[in-house]
Each structure stands twice: as structure tokens, then as C-alpha cells.
């Protein structure tokens, strides 16, 4: 019986996601056993600086990918939105389980909705994507950076001078906390989700055919297709955490991919947004990127990167 070593970050959410996925594999009843190896990433250690200032995408995966390449672990369970657009040579996303709710969750101290928040209220987020879109809707709000795991951020909302914070609905759902804490879900038209938000990425070595065969049982074709379009868009624009960038794709009734893509200025005064429909994930992602580039997306990205230095 083969033992599969599964790499995971140490946070409660990461371990919850990892154990959930292992349970899906165990339910297949195939002759494998599983062991979780906890790995500390750079993103877990640097908590006093905003993500965008310490290198953005890859912060939560590099050390785990190193463990995959050195064969310390066989596979890793990541949040798809933490994945860089390009993976190291020899590694691949071997499986994308069915995506859960991709929306952002708005959590306010007083129970006020986003529209009802008092003028000048303090909004906690560590995401340039969220802050740009929410400032575009409510320029009067003040954004204050907030870092840490879900539980840390919820504690900071209670104890510190934040009026509201924004978290991913998916993480709260996986922890079973969504009904308890969420004031409202932000509609995708108000705040376009991050590329891959709500989805998991199961990363493994390309040459591990045995494991890839096992993972195929849990793969969700719709999630794979829609997330692929989002990631092609991200790759073409070379967008990481340093840039207000968003991309969310769904499948229409006749199986076409509909991708809404967005790039914004840091302060939300400029939001470029395009929706592209097509059947090929790569073509849809590239088309969305090209349309935004024609509108000046590259200049916005350049300005955002300069602003982070």
C-alpha cells in the first residue's frame, strides 16, 4: 500500500482544506494511506508587511513546491488564489476539486451592510483587488491593511479600530463559520473575485502517473475549465498580489466560458473591466487580457508596481 505524503500550510484553514481533500480520496476506497506534513511558508512568517510589498504571488507556496521537487512530499493542497500564474518545471496542478462560493464576504462590527457603513468608516483588507473595487464604490471609506489568518482577522475586527473587514467566503465556509460571522456576500459585479477564488489547487509532480490517476477521480471539469481561463488572463498580464487584478469565469447554459476580468488603479479611481465569452479557456483568457491592455492595463500595472517599491 502506497503512503502519500501531503504538504499543507499550518493554518487552521489550510489543514481543514487538506484534511477535507484527503477524506475525498479515502472515500474512493483505493489502497492508499495518507500523511500530512505541515510546512511553514514565507507568507506565514512575514505578518507585519502587506502582501503586495513582500513579493505577492507565490508567498504561500514556494516552500511547499520545494518540498514537492525534493520529494519530501507527494502532493500539496493550496488555495488556488495563492498559486502563481507559472509553476516550477516538473510540477503541475493535478486536480481542481469543485469550486465553492467565490464571492468576497463583508463582515461589519455593527452589522451594517457595505452600503450602510458610516461615511469615512475603516475597512480592513490586505488585498489591493478588494480595496480598489470597494473604494471605487465608496471613495469615502478608509482602507487599513490587515494581515493574519482568518481567526486572527476576526479577532482584530473585534478588538481594533476596524469597522468592517473583507474575507473570502470560501474559507469561512470551509471552517463552518459563514453563517455566524458574514454580514453580507459582495456581489461579483461589485467586487470581482480573485483569480481562482473559492477553488483548491492540488499540486503534484508531472511524472507521478500513479497519483495523477488517483487525483483524476476528484477533478471537477467545470472548475478546471473556468479557472484555466482566469489563470491564462493572469499570466498574460503578469499580475500578482502587487496589482489590483481580478478574474472570474463561469460556464453559461450552452457550455461557453464567460470571463469577467478587471484591472484597477491602486486608489480605485480607474477600473478597467471586460467580459469575454468563448469555448476555449486559453483564447478567452488571452482575449480578456488583450482587451484590457488596449485600454491601458499595462500602464496601471506598471504604476501599481512602482507604488509598491
UniProtKB/Swiss-Prot annotation:
Cofactor binding: number and manner: Binds 1 dipyrromethane group covalently.
EC number in record: 2.5.1.61
Residue(s) carrying S-(dipyrrolylmethanemethyl)cysteine: 241
Cofactor(s) recorded in Swiss-Prot or TrEMBL: dipyrromethane
Gene from which the chain derives: hemC
GO biological process, one term: protoporphyrinogen IX biosynthetic process
Catalyses which reaction(s): 4 porphobilinogen + H2O = hydroxymethylbilane + 4 NH4(+)
Broad class of enzyme this protein falls into: transferase
Assembly description: Monomer.
Gene3D superfamilies for this protein: Periplasmic binding protein-like II, Porphobilinogen deaminase, C-terminal domain
GO molecular function: hydroxymethylbilane synthase activity
Pathway(s) of this molecule: Porphyrin-containing compound metabolism; protoporphyrin-IX biosynthesis; coproporphyrinogen-III from 5-aminolevulinate: step 2/4
Family named by the database record: Belongs to the HMBS family.
HAMAP family named in the record: Porphobil_deam
GO cellular component: cytoplasm
Additional facts recorded: The porphobilinogen subunits are added to the dipyrromethane group.
Keywords: Porphyrin biosynthesis, Transferase
PANTHER family to which the protein is assigned, alphabetical: PORPHOBILINOGEN DEAMINASE
Protein name: Porphobilinogen deaminase
Function summary: Tetrapolymerization of the monopyrrole PBG into the hydroxymethylbilane pre-uroporphyrinogen in several discrete steps.
Amino acid at each position: 500500500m502506497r503512503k502519500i505524503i501531503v504538504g499543507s500550510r499550518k493554518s487552521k484553514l489550510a489543514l481543514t482544506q487538506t484534511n477535507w481533500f484527503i477524506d475525498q480520496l479515502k472515500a474512493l476506497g483505493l489502497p492508499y494511506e495518507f500523511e500530512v506534513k505541515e510546512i511553514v511558508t514565507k507568507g506565514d512568517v512575514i505578518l507585519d508587511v502587506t502582501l503586495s510589498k513582500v513579493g505577492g504571488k507565490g508567498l504561500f507556496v514556494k516552500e511547499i513546491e520545494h518540498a514537492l521537487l525534493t520529494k519530501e512530499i507527494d502532493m500539496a493542497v493550496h488555495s488556488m488564489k495563492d498559486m502563481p500564474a507559472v509553476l516550477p518545471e516538473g510540477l503541475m496542478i493535478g486536480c481542481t476539486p469543485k469550486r465553492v462560493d467565490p464571492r468576497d464576504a463583508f463582515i461589519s462590527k455593527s452589522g451594517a451592510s457595505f452600503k450602510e457603513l458610516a461615511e469615512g468608516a475603516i475597512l480592513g483588507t490586505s488585498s489591493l483587488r478588494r480595496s480598489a473595487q470597494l473604494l471605487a464604490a465608496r471613495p469615502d471609506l478608509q482602507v487599513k491593511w490587515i494581515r493574519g489568518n482568518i481567526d486572527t482577522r476576526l479577532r482584530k475586527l473585534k478588538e481594533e479600530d476596524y469597522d468592517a473587514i473583507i474575507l473570502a467566503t470560501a474559507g469561512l465556509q470551509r471552517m463552518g463559520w459563514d453563517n455566524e460571522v458574514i454580514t453580507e456576500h459582495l456581489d461579483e459585479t461589485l467586487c470581482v473575485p480573485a483569480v481562482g477564488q473559492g477553488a483548491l489547487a492540488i499540486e503534484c509532480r508531472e511524472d507521478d502517473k500513479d497519483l495523477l490517476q488517483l487525483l483524476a477521480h476528484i477533478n471537477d471539469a467545470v472548475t478546471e475549465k473556468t479557472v484555466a481561463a482566469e489563470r491564462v488572463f493572469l499570466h498574460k498580464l503578469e499580475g500578482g498580489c502587487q496589482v489590483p487584478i481580478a478574474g472570474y469565469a463561469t460556464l453559461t447554459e450552452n457550455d461557453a466560458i464567460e470571463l469577467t476580468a478587471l484591472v484597477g488603479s491602486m486608489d480605485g479611481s480607474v477600473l478597467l473591466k471586460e467580459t469575454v465569452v468563448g469555448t476555449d479557456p486559453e483564447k478567452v483568457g488571452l482575449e480578456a487580457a488583450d482587451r484590457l491592455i488596449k485600454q491601458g492595463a499595462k500602464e496601471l500595472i506598471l504604476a501599481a508596481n512602482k507604488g509598491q517599491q
